[in-house]
Amino acid sequence: AANPHLCGSHLVEALYLVCGERGFFYQPKGIHZZCCHKPCBIFZLZBYCN
């Protein structure tokens, strides 16, 4: 399956799912470049978990 482009609220939702109770730090610029402009995978999302 292809990795989705995640933008805006979809991106935040994905972070909640991946990070769960650990929570995450939301850096719109960095993660937006990585996941909205081009597709990112679950491991890239995990980099933003606390």
From Swiss-Prot:
It comes from the Eukaryota. One of its GO terms (molecular function) is hormone activity. InterPro entries: Insulin (IPR004825), Insulin-like (IPR016179), Insulin-like_sf (IPR036438), Insulin_CS (IPR022353), Insulin_family (IPR022352). SUPFAM superfamilies: Insulin-like. GO terms for biological process: glucose metabolic process. Its main location: secreted. Belongs to the insulin family. Insulin decreases blood glucose concentration. It increases cell permeability to monosaccharides, amino acids and fatty acids. It accelerates glycolysis, the pentose phosphate cycle, and glycogen synthesis in liver. This is Insulin. The gene is ins.
